[in-house]
Amino acid sequence: MTTKVAANSAAYEAIVRAGPRVKQLQQVHAHLIVTGYGRSRSLLTKLITLACSARAIAYTHLLFLSVPLPDDFLFNSVIKSTSKLRLPLHCVAYYRRMLSSNVSPSNYTFTSVIKSCADLSALRIGKGVHCHAVVSGFGLDTYVQAALVTFYSKCGDMEGARQVFDRMPEKSIVAWNSLVSGFEQNGLADEAIQVFYQMRESGFEPDSATFVSLLSACAQTGAVSLGSWVHQYIISEGLDLNVKLGTALINLYSRCGDVGKAREVFDKMKETNVAAWTAMISAYGTHGYGQQAVELFNKMEDDCGPIPNNVTFVAVLSACAHAGLVEEGRSVYKRMTKSYRLIPGVEHHVCMVDMLGRAGFLDEAYKFIHQLDATGKATAPALWTAMLGACKMHRNYDLGVEIAKRLIALEPDNPGHHVMLSNIYALSGKTDEVSHIRDGMMRNNLRKQVGYSVIEVENKTYMFSMGDESHQETGEIYLYLETLISRCKEIGYAPVSEEVMHQVEEEEKEFALRYHSEKLAVAFDHCEG
């Protein structure tokens, strides 16, 4: 008996030494078979776990099938490993095999499988696992519930996520973070911020994961005061300004217009990655600092920074387009394809057309699109939209009409294309065509999507649309705005109505210009101040 135990121990040590390396594991497996230990459950379980860690799925499954009656420990080992390695299809497959083998799952089983369903965004399958967890007595398990909150959030079912969360007898920081993140990632930034406040009221202290989601929510809503508070909290509490936190802060300050603060955060980051560099480059480009964006990109290349990816090149090319840096943009595009061998996507092509068009190189932009057309890549409406904008900017109305008609043929139900065609006709003096477009839009019930302006006042965000009268202080806002416009007119201000949609009547243009959403937001800020 002593000899057998020693041999078993030696075999186990050999497996551990082999680690997650397939060739060595296969050699150890062969040795086990030769020495008579090839069907040892404990040794096979260790072999299977390591083979799975090496992502040798076929070999893992072969080993698994060699076990006559897999127990719950073996099933949980492969389910946990496949879930951790982001192999969700395999995880769900082993879970189903577990059920068909009449082996009872544990809370760890359900936690891993639910995470895999979240990775797959498999709402129907995940709901089935949820039901099984409840029937099996694990419906109120802390780990299972936290995984369920994440699962429903990733599947876009925030109502389901909230229901699970509200039923939790004990809420963990992980569950709170999952809910905040879920609302933020599903575009419900205000709800994410409210959950954060509820979390604080419940006595939970936020961590780095909380702040990453919260900062993204602040960026979406323009809640710069709350975002600045988060930044100060990070500093005062001595939290590590890791890559995710730093990048989230850069995005926040960029969205709120404070590029200097964004750069300050970037320079203080001890560690950066391609996402952080791209965020900072994008911040410069968005606010018209094209030269600084290009210089930072060059620094990224010259100072052994991270290798730029497709998103980085979109940020640089967009910066060049907005700043009129045509030669720099051409050079960047060439380096992308030649030096980095990246394949440009629609976003890169749109940036190139926009850059050339804004600079007045309409023929070159048009030729660029037709070169893409020859390869079947010019069907994206965004390309023609960028070209149309350039035609309007440089008053090439004939080409603009041709492109607008092409866009309408591609997307007949997009009201924006009809509006652009109407504007082109109006600018060229073809009022009959303007009326024709307007009547057609009314017949087909095509309405341009309403634009909004958001402003933060005393840590609260407010949203305004054109001619908005929903605010409780509407009278005061409009009175202030009228006074301000009167003073502006006294010093020579005159509205340029051609920038407003040309399918509206003159009095409507005046209304649109006078009560633009941005003007209402600024007036409200002054009233409150």
Regions found by a protein language model. Give the residues of each.
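Terminal (and in a subset, N-terminal) low-complexity or junction segments at the ends
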Residues: M1-S172, S181, D190-E201, E205-G529
